[in-house]
């Protein structure tokens, strides 16, 4: 066997031994050299191979090292005077990258190219396709160029990962996958100009990652191999969609929200109402259970929905961001503004299905429908009085407790209902928003306008039960009733009534 054949065989055996994961080398020897090296990104012999200065070899060097005109091209570690490769971002490169010199023999250069061709068909990790720069080259780059190479390294801007030489991006041997790109940050990293201390050991080899050992400071440990087959830009076809993408396309249950498909798969067990979202069902169930988990920190009032609590808290802040463009009146809620604007437009969108009466508010329609059904489900526990709405019951209960939570900011007078406070404020401002269409007279209260309009129509709905006299206002009836109960006139009428009753019931006089 010739000397060249023996050299090739020895080199192949050495390469196989280097492929075994877990080969431990001193990191100080790996990164402290002075020789500038760049890995070959392709299997071809190209102009990207850098020349290396020749050094005298020691007598104990291997046969490959003693070969004239060559340098170590499958060396596991650079020599102590070599300058190791530097990877932007501080990632430690793989030490098994072939390095050639221009002075090598043609036969050995061809053999290296053949080995690279075989090596390109093996599963590799991210280190095999990473960007390699020497520390000196990295230091010559300005801040913009360094950021650009970092972007290329992380797969940004659609660029494939490749080898970098003297500021030029070389097409990569393989395109790193997303998992490989993300795993960069899990490897051991050193900042530019920072070298690991001597005595630290690095597990190297194909399929090996480097991670910091949190158990011992300054130590590194190998991570599980996550090598993947190579993908070249020419051979790579359309990628197979992931399981999540296939599930989204097929509409697999649990990955596609029912709200997107229009289905109402969540049913209420009590009333059978359907919902597209489970959260909506949970909120709806509180209407049956009466649960109110959201509490106002200012007044202690509780709500079943967080949105209702947020709307309520505006009352305490006094904020009124919604203004009517017609009368410039401000409101704390947008829905209240919409209801107010119907006063100007005359719109009454809510119609009773029994009598066709129209209303501007839904709550007014619900209250009106109680007159047809006679249902009053809300009962006062103190006086047993019933009401059609829960809000009416709450207002009524203040007559028992004496609570008046609405004070006037001008005079300090308190009221049990907000509507009474609003009407009272008009006595300070002099506002009279209610106008009679017949005579143009204005009023501060809507009830005053309603009573006034009866004078034009001649309607007198309030009648005295004792004498039958009718009145257009309830207050006039109450004033009239006092005539029957108090005063000299009432006493005379009682005497006349008693006399008349006695005359009718007195027995006939006895005959003589």
Swiss-Prot record:
Disordered, as annotated region: 1-104, 187-261
Gene Ontology MF terms in the entry: DNA-binding transcription repressor activity, RNA polymerase II-specific; RNA polymerase II transcription regulatory region sequence-specific DNA binding; zinc ion binding
One GO cellular component, as annotated: nucleus
CDD domains: KRAB_A-box
SMART domains per the UniProt record, alphabetical: KRAB, ZnF_C2H2
Residue numbers covered by the propeptide annotation in the UniProt entry: 1-5
Origin superkingdom: Eukaryota
Keyword list, A-Z: DNA-binding, Metal-binding, Nucleus, Repeat, Repressor, Transcription, Transcription regulation, Zinc, Zinc-finger
Major localization listed first in the record, in broad terms: nucleus
Coiled coil: none
Keyword Transport: no
Pfam families for the chain: KRAB, zf-C2H2
Record field: compositional bias (Basic and acidic residues): 47-67, 228-252
UniProt-listed InterPro entries: KRAB, KRAB_dom_sf, Znf_C2H2_sf, Znf_C2H2_type
Domain topic, free-text comment: The KRAB domain is required for transcriptional repression.
Annotated function: Transcriptional repressor that binds to the promoter region of Mpv17l isoform M-LP short and regulates its age-dependent and heat-induced expression. By regulating Mpv17l expression, contributes to the regulation of genes involved in H(2)O(2) metabolism and the mitochondrial apoptotic cascade.
Family to which the UniProt record says this protein belongs: Belongs to the krueppel C2H2-type zinc-finger protein family.
Designated name of the protein: Transcriptional repressor Rhit
Species of origin: Mus musculus (Mouse)
The encoding gene: Zfp13
């Amino acid at each position: 066997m010739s000397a060249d054949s023996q050299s090739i065989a020895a080199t192949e055996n050495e390469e196989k031994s280097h492929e075994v994961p877990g080969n431990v080398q001193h990191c100080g020897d790996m990164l402290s050299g002075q020789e500038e090296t760049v890995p070959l990104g392709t299997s071809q012999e190209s102009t990207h191979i850098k020349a290396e200065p020749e050094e005298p070899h020691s007598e104990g060097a291997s046969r490959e090292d003693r070969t004239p005109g060559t340098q170590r091209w499958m060396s596991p570690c650079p020599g102590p005077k070599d300058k190791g490769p530097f990877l932007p971002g501080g990632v430690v490169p793989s030490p098994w990258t072939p390095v050639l010199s221009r002075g090598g023999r043609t036969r050995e250069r061809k053999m290296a190219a053949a080995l690279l061709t075989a090596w390109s068909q093996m599963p590799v990790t991210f280190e095999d396709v990473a960007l390699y720069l020497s520390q000196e080259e990295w230091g010559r780059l300005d801040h913009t160029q360094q950021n650009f190479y970092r972007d290329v390294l992380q797969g940004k801007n659609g660029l494939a990962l490749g080898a970098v030489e003297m500021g030029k991006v070389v097409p990569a041997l393989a395109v790193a996958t997303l998992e490989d790109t993300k795993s960069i940050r899990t490897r051991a990293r050193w900042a530019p100009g920072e070298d690991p201390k001597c005595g630290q050991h690095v597990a190297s080899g194909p399929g090996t990652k480097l991670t910091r050992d949190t158990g011992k400071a300054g130590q590194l440990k190998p991570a599980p191999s996550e090598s993947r087959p190579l993908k070249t830009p020419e051979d790579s076809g359309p990628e197979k969609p992931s399981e999540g993408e296939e599930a989204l396309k097929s509409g697999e249950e649990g990955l596609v929200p029912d709200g997107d498909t229009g289905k109402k798969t969540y049913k209420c067990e009590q009333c059978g109402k359907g919902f597209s979202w489970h959260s909506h069902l949970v909120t709806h169930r509180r209407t049956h259970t009466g649960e109110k988990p959201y509490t106002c920190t200012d007044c202690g009032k509780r709500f079943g929905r967080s949105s209702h609590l947020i709307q309520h808290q505006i009352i305490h802040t006094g904020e009124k961001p919604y203004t009517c463009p017609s009368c410039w009146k401000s409101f704390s809620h947008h829905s209240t503004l919409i209801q107010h604007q119907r006063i100007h437009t005359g719109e009454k969108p809510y119609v009773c299905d029994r009598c066709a009466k129209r209303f501007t508010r839904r709550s007014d329609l619900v209250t009106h429908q109680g007159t047809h059904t006679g249902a009053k489900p809300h009962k006062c526990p103190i006086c047993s009085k019933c009401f059609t709405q829960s809000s009416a019951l709450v207002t009524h209960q203040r007559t028992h407790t004496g609570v008046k939570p609405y004070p006037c900011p001008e005079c300090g007078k308190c009221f049990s209902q907000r509507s009474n406070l609003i009407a009272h404020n008009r006595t300070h401002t002099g506002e009279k928003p209610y106008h009679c269409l017949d005579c143009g007279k204005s009023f501060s209260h809507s009830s005053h306008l309603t009573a006034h309009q009866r004078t034009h129509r001649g309607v007198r709905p309030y009648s005295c039960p004792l004498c039958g006299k009718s009145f257009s206002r309830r207050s006039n009836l109450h004033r009239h009733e006092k005539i029957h109960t108090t005063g000299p006139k009432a006493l005379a009428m009682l005497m006349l009534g008693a006399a008349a009753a006695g005359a009718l019931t007195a027995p006939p006089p006895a005959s003589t």
